[in-house]
């Protein structure tokens, strides 16, 4: 599988406790992206953040927060990301979704 040099980065900002069909939402998103043969996906866990509610979520020891911020990043062509968006829309109830144009410098193992 190849990703074009001019590609798109899809970022999905959700909470650790968000669910889809009794599974963690971040896991369901990555598995669906894999099923749809998207170029790659990574889940990042944030130690601190806030969203539209302005409620602070933190991993500090003295203030154990549940529902830490998670970011799912998916990279592929604009066409394939656009095909994924309607599927994603059925999965997320709240969160922030962004798209950025990127340049892919390397994908996979160098020959």
Sequence positions of predicted segments:
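Positively charged, small/polar-rich N-terminal and surface patches that mediate targeting and assembly
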Residues: 1-111
């Amino acid at each position: 599988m190849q990703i074009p040099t001019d590609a798109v980065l899809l970022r999905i900002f959700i909470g650790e406790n968000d669910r889809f069909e009794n599974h963690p939402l971040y896991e369901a998103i990555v598995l669906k992206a894999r099923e749809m043969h998207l170029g790659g996906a990574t889940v990042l866990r944030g130690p601190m953040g806030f969203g539209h509610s302005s409620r602070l979520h933190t991993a500090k020891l003295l203030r154990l927060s549940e529902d830490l911020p998670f970011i799912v990043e998916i990279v592929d062509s604009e066409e394939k990301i656009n095909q994924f968006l309607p599927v994603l829309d059925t999965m997320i109830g709240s969160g922030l979704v962004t798209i950025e144009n990127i340049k892919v410098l390397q994908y996979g193992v160098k020959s």
